Regions:
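ATP/NTP phosphate-donor binding region
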Residues: 1-58, 288, 295-299
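Glycine-rich beta-strand-to-loop/alpha-helix junction loops that act as flexible
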Residues: 12, 61-63, 88-91
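Catalytic core of DAGKc-family lipid kinases
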Residues: 21, 79-84, 90-192
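Short glycine/serine/threonine-rich phosphate/pyrophosphate-binding segments
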Residues: 43, 65-70, 95-96
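Short Gly/Thr/Asp-enriched flexible loops that form oxyanion-binding sites at enzyme active sites
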Residues: 66-80
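Short hydrophobic-aromatic micro-motifs
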Residues: 128-141, 189-198, 203-204, 218-221, ...
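Internal helical hairpin/lid segments
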Residues: 191-243
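ATP/nucleoside-binding phosphotransfer catalytic cores, i.e., glycine-rich phosphate-binding loops
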Residues: 223-299
Length: 299
């Protein structure tokens, strides 16, 4: 195999920041050319370069944010549906890797030769792709304020936990949701502290992996947070657990969120503000190598 037909993009300082040399060695053994990021935005630039050069198999070593940057670059080069993605978990929470059944760096490299290739849904928001989730609402600094330790334990939910901690002084936003697909159309209007849109992640009941091949988002609208001194993680389970009156659950292929005021959106950790945003799925748009524990139809 010609080196260059397989390319790995690595964030050498993601996670604990001690994986770079191991990744270089394993990548060479698997025939991957290695491109490394040096700062913010490099993942997107390198992803676009890979797309423009016609790379057919790409590996990304970093966290969910690095993967998101690379996918945005591939999308900008109109190459998202022309490439096979290999995920090498090198971040803190590694939510996408977990959903794909990829345990660690060595396991990720093992799968570059023998992992099953599945065609997975890609979420789109504001014209940009995301794989794990898009979260709307909460104060703008909730995502960046989430601690590394919290992200390690809860991943994307760290944003929700931090938001709940700050929601004591946050009155919520007047929102309208218009939802389509999944057997019909629906709408919701009212005051909410957050809207959780999951592609690889479910936010209700027991959480965990969502169905990434059904063309639908799992959507949860959280109206308010529990009062009192309830522990934050218990609050998460109370909020998102089955039968909670303050949470509304939908499944939809397209979700439009509209507000009179700017709303903060966190798309796999990438922050933007809009008073109107539409999220939709591109069904089975990205070929991804998965581990043997990946569940195409999770319960």
């Amino acid at each position: 195999m010609q080196v260059g037909s397989r390319t790995l993009i690595m964030n050498p300082v993601s996670g604990t920041g001690d994986h770079a040399e191991l990744v270089r060695q394993l990548a060479r053994g698997k025939g991957f050319a290695v491109w490394e990021t040096e700062g913010a935005g490099d993942g997107r630039a390198l992803g676009r370069r890979a797309g423009e050069e016609g790379v057919s198999e790409i590996a990304v070593c970093g966290g969910d944010g690095t993967i998101n940057e690379v996918l945005r670059g591939l999308n900008a080069a109109d190459h998202l549906d022309e490439v096979t993605l290999n995920v090498i978990p090198g971040g803190t929470a590694n939510l996408l890797a977990g959903a794909l059944g990829i345990r660690d760096i060595r396991h990720g490299f093992d799968l570059t030769d023998k992992g099953e290739i599945r065609s997975l849904d890609v979420g789109m928001a504001d014209g940009e792709p995301f794989m794990v989730s898009c979260i709307a609402g909460f104060p703008a600094d909730a995502s960046t304020a989430a601690s590394g330790e919290l992200k390690e334990r809860l991943g994307t939910l760290a944003f929700v936990v931090t938001g709940i901690q700050e929601a004591v002084e946050f009155e919520g936003l007047e929102l309208r949701l218009d939802l389509h697909g999944g057997g019909g159309s629906d709408s919701w209007e009212g005051s909410a502290v957050t809207v959780l849109v999951g592609n690889a992640r479910r936010f209700i009941e027991e959480g965990g992996q969502a169905d990434m091949e059904d063309g639908l988002f799992d959507v949860a609208v959280v109206e308010d947070v529990p009062a009192g001194n309830l522990a934050v993680e218990a609050a998460i389970h109370r909020l998102l657990g089955e039968g909670t009156d303050s949470v509304h659950h939908f499944r939809a292929a397209q979700v439009t969120v509209t507000s009179d005021d700017p709303v903060t959106f966190s798309r796999d950790g990438e922050i933007a503000e809009h008073d109107r945003a539409t999220m939709y799925t591109r069904p089975q748009a990205l070929d991804v190598r998965v581990g043997p524990e990946y569940e195409p139809r999770p319960d």
